[in-house]
């Protein structure tokens, strides 16, 4: 789903860049036990600011950054001019990559834009290696409830009827085989509450020793953590 004019302005604004680098990245880095990734995928890369931060703070050997909007990809290519980074126009719910292609996948607020978000999560699980990390900052229908959430609804073009709640999102991650490593709620500048999450695909060795697997891991978090 492409951005309307207001959203396009916001994601390309200094405010968005400031929030990403000063709030989201430090929190996500603290949530990761390891920051060494060889091959990274960023979905919904937009103008490339998130890609630039991944390069700066994680320095993977190679980054593949995708976006559905060709206009955003052209902007991103100007933002990050590096031979170790490849930008592609691609739908995050139908990824054109082989199974187990990436050590880490980053998402800075794109999945809530996708009506068929479960397909997207399934694809992320497919292309992430065993032992790989899903690192994300996301919004949910909870963001757009109450005030000022309902005001945002009148201004932002999102698939609200299909949008997940925070709890539903976490439970679906576990259903398809992710293990939740860490979860935090965030609301920098007190303007738009969202959540930060790190999940992993258990390695084969871990799967053999932990037969309880992902089904019961949600119990480690209180339901209030997701609201």
Q: What function would you assign to each model-found segment?
A:
Residues 15-21, 135-195:
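C-terminal alpha-helical "lid/dimerization" subdomain adjacent to the S-adenosyl-L-methionine
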Residues 109-113:
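Short catalytic micro-motifs in class I SAM-dependent methyltransferases
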Residues 118-130:
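A short glycine-rich, Lys/Arg-flanked "PGG" loop and its adjoining helix->strand segment in the class I
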Residues 71, 115-119:
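Short N-terminal helix/helix-N-cap motif within the alpha/beta-hydrolase-1
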Residues 1-34, 49, 53, 72:
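Conserved class I S-adenosyl-L-methionine
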Residues 182-213, 221, 226-227:
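Core SAM-dependent methyltransferase catalytic element
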Residues 41, 47-94:
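Class I SAM-dependent methyltransferase SAM/SAH-binding core
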Residues 106:
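A conserved beta-strand element that flanks and buttresses the S-adenosyl-L-methionine
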């Amino acid at each position: 789903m492409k951005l309307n004019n207001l959203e396009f302005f916001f994601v390309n604004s200094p405010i968005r860049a400031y929030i990403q680098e000063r709030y989201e990245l430090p929190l996500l880095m603290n949530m990761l036990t390891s920051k060494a990734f060889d091959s990274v995928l960023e979905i919904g890369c937009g103008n490339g600011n998130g890609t630039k931060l991944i390069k700066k703070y994680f320095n993977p050997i190679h980054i593949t950054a995708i976006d559905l909007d060709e206009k955003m990809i052209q902007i991103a290519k100007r933002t990050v001019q590096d031979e170790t980074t490849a930008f592609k126009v691609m739908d995050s719910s139908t990824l054109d990559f082989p199974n187990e292609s990436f050590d880490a996948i980053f998402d800075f607020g794109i999945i809530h834009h996708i009506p068929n978000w479960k397909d997207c999560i399934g694809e992320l699980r497919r292309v992430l290696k065993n032992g790989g990390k899903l690192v994300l900052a996301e919004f949910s229908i909870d963001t757009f409830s109450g005030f000022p959430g309902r005001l945002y609804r009148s201004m932002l073009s999102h698939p609200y009827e299909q949008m997940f709640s925070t709890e539903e999102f976490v439970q679906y991650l576990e259903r398809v085989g992710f293990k939740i490593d860490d979860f935090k709620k965030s609301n920098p500048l007190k303007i738009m509450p969202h959540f930060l999450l790190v999940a992993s695909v258990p390695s084969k060795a871990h799967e053999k020793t932990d037969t309880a697997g992902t089904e019961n891991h949600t119990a480690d978090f209180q339901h209030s953590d997701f609201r």
